[in-house]
Amino acid sequence: MASVLVLVTTSCFLIHCKQKKDIQVPRTVIEDNTTYLIQDSILIQTRDGVKIHAIVVRNSKITKPNPAILFHTIYSRKSDLQKAKMAADHGYVGVISYTRGKGLSPDSIVPFKKEATDTYDVIEWISRQEWSDQKVGMYGGSYVGFVQWASVKHGVHPALKTIVPSVSVAPGIAEPMENGVHQNFHFPWHHYVSNNKYLDTTLYSNGQRWQDLNMKWYGEGVAYNKMDSLDGLPNPQFNERLLHPTYDAYWQSMMPYKEEFSHIDIPVLSTTGYYDGGQTGTRYYLNEHTKYNKDAAHYLVIGPYTHFGAQGKPNTHILGYDIDPAAQIDITGLIFEWFDHILKGKKKPSLLKDKINYEVMGANKWGHAPSLEQMANDTLTYYLSSKRSGVAFKSTYDSGNNGENVHFSLEERPSDPKGYLEQTIDFLDRSNFTWNSSGWGSIIADNLTIGQGFSFVTEPFTSDFEINGSFGGEMSVSINKKDFDYSVALYEQTPDGKFFALTLPYVGRASYVLNREKRQLLRPNIKTKIPFGIVRMTSKKIGKGSRLVVVVNGIKDPFTEINYGSGKPVSEENMTDATPPLVITWYSDSHIDIPVKKNKIYLSMATLCK
């Protein structure tokens, strides 16, 4: 700790004064014939007196002021020096800074809540260093993506010239809940980042512990906010967040909210994937930025990538699917091409031919559009019919479709608008294989998992076309309770009977879909129209002879907060709220709207028969 920064006098915070010399004498390190100047024990004092640990790496050959690349993260690792060196290798000053309390910071660890001002203050500090030319770019994914948006909440620092958020977390929107539904994998995350100054990898990596906890919570039926009591290790951050099920001031204070997006006038490059859990966050920021700033220079790159693949170099094989050669791009390389363009005036990356840049799965090509809406030139609308299609399929558990492995029909017009299918979910039954799980573990599969829900299928298509964008529509339902959680998944069923998952399933809580800031309970046994919240987008060539399949289902499983429908705060509900069983009536005027890009000839067999 001898090399830790000694701060200047208390009357002059670092964020307000230009220092005459480096606050920590750089040490010289030679690697691969490159000489680096490294400061790895810097403490930056924020406006409220907290100290932020930072690392700075420069190439000794660069003697004039230079742009800096900032990576501000909660995931403090001893190996982060390499990330700063990578920026230096690209001709920049590499800066790593950590969430308050992390690394060498002596303060308490505070995830999320102070990043807006702390990151701004780090940028201010960078801009006042002798090696800085007052140009800063930021990049990084997941939490680090959120941090970049937080940094511009109260205004864009004059030195900040661009942000490159990947697979961005959006607290209160896309984590720890998605469209109102909490998911259990967030529970151990708080221990991971808050148990020590770096990361509690040992505890976090104990998959058996978290699996056992999920099963114990599910089996005993205790309230969601008692999960840490079952675990035996207090989790105050997890419980604090459960006190805010709506998108209230607690969440709004963390990142830009509504009109605050209007002042974000720097170029933005976002990256995400069709199979990225963080796509909902990326989509939220894109939607809000372009809504409140009509001139937003916001670019998107999206392809068949997972959460980690969309941050760096995607794997060529993901979840049973070999991605197209065209999709096998170096996203890290693209990011630094972008920095060269914005910070050094070089040519814009060739991939960015328009604002929205997307890889069309199965077509081995990239598409480009000025906006999300312009990715498609038509919409397919299908209604969830209660009539059988006659199309049999292989079911994973033989548990849905009222016990028969035959799809119901997706109709282009509702033949019986008053028709319906009824689903009963018994929350008291926690026996094995009663999980109401629908979804998939492999993008391409022989079987379809529908839980106790229902699957619906189109007629086979007579020509190729592209699905481009996010499906919409509305569910027409009635329930015997006041609320429920549900999922909707979209697949291509190929002529050989295989199922291709087009993106991750949509999940939503009915009482929050209309207004995430105010819960609106359903009236029992009254038919209600429920629109969709944020739906992940996709792009894929749908081949001639293929069909589209939609799976709808209520949610009851060991990995997701259980909404018993009593109307009480869901995190407080327990097995005493389980009766009566939830009865969901899915009406046949429910419809799914699917954005497509078609050529002149585009008809399904059903259309030809009209």
Which residues does each predicted region cover?
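N-terminal cap/lid segment of alpha/beta-hydrolase-fold proteins
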Residues: 26-62, 461-463
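Proline/glycine-enriched tight loop/beta-turn segments at coil->beta junctions
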Residues: 50-52, 60-68, 132, 263-264
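Short beta-strand element of the alpha/beta-hydrolase
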Residues: 55, 64-74, 548
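Gly/Ser-rich "nucleophile elbow"/oxyanion-hole loop immediately N-terminal to the catalytic nucleophile
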Residues: 60-65, 108-115, 121-142
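Short amphipathic alpha-helix adjacent to the substrate-entry channel of hydrolases
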Residues: 79-95, 287
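Accessory cap/linker subdomain of secreted extracellular hydrolases
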Residues: 89, 152-262
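C-terminal, loop-rich substrate-recognition/catalytic regions characterized by aromatic stacking residues
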Residues: 218, 317-610
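Short beta-strand/loop motif that positions the catalytic acidic residue
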Residues: 264, 270-272
